[in-house]
């Protein structure tokens, strides 16, 4: 049986593990620049200048990392 690949979780986990700087665009146009410190099914913790913010995923439009994120292919999962 194949395991389901969750691209969102892989992407956010790589941002977190590699401490990749990211710009988070919210639906209201606001931008957060920082690092992903953690996430769950509904929220993401973004740290900016030593301060953490809990952001609900439904308020997020886009994650724009400063470098490409390497995702595992299906054979590696």
Curated annotation (Swiss-Prot):
| Annotated Sm domain residues | 9-69
A single GO BP: regulation of RNA stability
Transmembrane intervals: none
Question: Span of the secretion signal?
Answer: none
Q: Which UniProt keywords apply?
A: RNA-binding, Stress response
**GO CC annotations on file:** cytosol
Please indicate if the UniProt record lists Hydrolase as a keyword: no
Q: Return any one Pfam family short name.
A: Hfq
| Gene3D superfamilies recorded | 2.30.30.100
Recorded hits in CDD domains, A to Z, give: Hfq (cd01716)
Task: Cite a single GO MF annotation.
Answer: RNA binding
Q: Does the keyword RNA-binding apply?
A: yes
Q: Which InterPro entries does the entry link to?
A: Hfq (IPR005001), LSM_dom_sf (IPR010920), Sm (IPR047575)
- Superkingdom of this protein's organism: Bacteria
Give the family this protein belongs to, as stated in its UniProt record. Belongs to the Hfq family.
Question: What does this gene product do?
Answer: RNA chaperone that binds small regulatory RNA (sRNAs) and mRNAs to facilitate mRNA translational regulation in response to envelope stress, environmental stress and changes in metabolite concentrations. Also binds with high specificity to tRNAs.
Subunit text:
Homohexamer.
Q: Tell me the protein's name.
A: RNA-binding protein Hfq
Q: Which organism is it from?
A: Shouchella clausii (strain KSM-K16) (Alkalihalobacillus clausii)
This protein's encoding gene:
hfq
